[in-house]
């Protein structure tokens, strides 16, 4: 198993490639969550953080999926669920095929189990309260039928309802339902909206509303000897999402949030596939 520093080094390497790719193709991206906080508070990783995540406006996010297949280094695999491929995520992940990072919820899947960089889309938040309720409704449907996984951390009622819905829905229909939901939840534009929201980050974050201006551009800040982008309106975003983001959490909360069955930054996941397959049985 690789240590935290090795994982951070590979994560930074991936992030540098990703940001350079976005620059080359005129795509807007910014660090989000702990990566953005680390850029401001630590000029690098939060010491206990083990990954970097990015936001992209929806239109750039959709372009990324097309451009990556044409122009990106084959070492980095873009994973995005489709009709015949489900990775149990709600968003794009970029996977480094020269590394290994096997997550419990994906260990039985046939996909590149390399270290992941998460890329999450941002969508418009409609002004009309009734439309906003519809958007959240569709986002929850999208979350269930795209991930095709029973949520374990959002209460017994949601777990029970999700189990029934998935159980009653044939696999052949799940893709059609989630594509319908995705279309409905992302149909709003700036004219009918007064905010930006996260629809693919889970039920908690889809309740958030950020100023549109916060994500109109990015700024680059020092980050581990290089520079990384964060939203131009980072304070409005981070204070809404996390409150007093410049104050570190208590010591008992300063731990990595992501678990991995195997994490090896020096070997490709292909060298572990036998072990991974054994865990399925």
Regions found by a protein language model. Name each.
Residues 2-25, 68-127, 147-241, 248-281:
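Conserved catalytic core of two-metal-ion nucleotidyltransferases
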Residues 19-52, 56, 61-62, 213, ...:
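Active-site nucleotide-donor binding segment shared across nucleotidyl transfer reactions
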Residues 45-46, 60, 143, 261-266:
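Short amphipathic alpha-helical patches
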Residues 64-66:
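Conserved SAM-binding loop
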Residues 129-134:
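A short secondary-structure junction signal
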Residues 136-139:
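Short, His- and charge-rich active-site/binding loops that engage polyanionic ligands
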